[in-house]
Curated annotation (Swiss-Prot):
The lineage of its organism: Bacteria, Pseudomonadati, Pseudomonadota, Gammaproteobacteria, Pasteurellales. The keyword Membrane applies. The gene is djlA. It comes from the Bacteria. Regulatory DnaK co-chaperone. Direct interaction between DnaK and DjlA is needed for the induction of the wcaABCDE operon, involved in the synthesis of a colanic acid polysaccharide capsule, possibly through activation of the RcsB/RcsC phosphotransfer signaling pathway. The colanic acid capsule may help the bacterium survive conditions outside the host. This is Co-chaperone protein DjlA. One of its GO terms (cellular component) is plasma membrane. The keyword Transmembrane helix applies.
């Protein structure tokens, strides 16, 4: 991130108000640096223009969603409704909605350059791991949303994960964590029985040792959300919880380029992490 704002704030603040003025100057400069980074432009050969990091995140999200939908052979009405629902959830204005729709349509093309688009996205985000994880979180949740995870969808997600720097093992682990996290959301409660009945998801179950039908999240789900095991001690679990909360902090993600329209999704992620941690503590009798 740019440090020029903090530097100028320090100098000007010191001259105008001495020590305390310098402190105020650094704080204001830091806020300025965050805004400059957020609004800074990046190059995109696919989107044919210099765009802000937030616009790059939004357009890449919908382009890959379009490609993911087409991977099954044809784009269904459910896929279109899912994309429309996401646009509504993000409260996109008319201009950004048009950009999102155009990106979704371009993503459906047979010659969509998936690897190139993801590489440019990764560079545009400054290779910030937390921001890249949030992007992948959106794609995985979208793939789960139609109550099945086809092999063709997994193949697309594998490529996305690979280009974002994840190994196959790390990606499989993330899939397990993301499914477990759904149990702590309202959408997870509503759809989990549909997942259990679906053949495509049954294959996914077998890969992870199987999920039992349930009326709500279990402590095993909570362990998967935090990426810990039942044998880990309180300090290990707390450390994993704090790391995930820090990585997924909504305000920090927005400052690093996450569109403000996706703030609610980031908040839901932290709520899932918090709920999982609370359930573990309750089960273990930890305070």
């Amino acid at each position: 991130m740019n440090f020029i704002g903090k530097f100028l704030g320090l100098i000007i603040g010191w001259k105008l108000g001495g020590f305390f003025g310098a402190i105020c100057g650094v704080i204001l400069g830091h806020l300025g640096d965050k805004k400059l980074y957020e609004l800074g432009t990046v190059n995109s050969s696919f989107f044919k223009s210099k765009i802000t990091r937030q616009s790059l995140f939004m357009q890449t999200t919908f382009a890959v969603l379009g490609h993911l939908s087409k991977a099954k052979g044809r784009v269904t009405e459910d896929d279109i409704q899912l994309a429309s629902h996401l646009m509504q959830q993000m409260q996109l204005d008319d201009a950004n909605r048009r950009l999102a729709q155009e990106a979704f349509t371009r993503g459906k093309a047979a010659d969509f350059p998936l690897r190139q688009v993801i590489r440019e996205f990764r560079l545009g985000c400054g290779q910030r791991a937390d921001l890249l994880r949030m992007f992948l979180h959106v794609q995985v949740q979208a793939a789960f949303a139609d109550a099945q995870l086809d092999q063709s969808e997994k193949d697309v997600l594998y490529i996305v994960g690979e280009e974002l720097g994840l190994s196959r093992f790390q990606f499989e682990q993330m899939l397990a964590m993301e499914f477990a996290a759904r149990q702590f959301s309202r959408a997870g409660y509503q759809q989990q029985n549909r997942y259990q009945r679906d053949y495509g998801y049954q294959q996914h179950q077998q890969q992870y040792g199987g999920y039992q039908q349930q009326s709500g999240p279990t402590v095993d789900d909570a362990y998967k959300v935090l990426g810990v095991s039942a044998t880990d001690d309180q300090q290990t679990v707390k450390r994993a919880y704090r790391r995930l909360m820090n990585e997924n902090h909504p305000d920090k993600l927005v400052a690093k380029g996450l569109p403000k329209e996706m703030l609610e999704m980031a908040k839901e992620k932290t709520q899932q992490i918090q709920s999982a941690y609370d359930l573990i503590c309750k089960t273990k009798g930890w305070k």
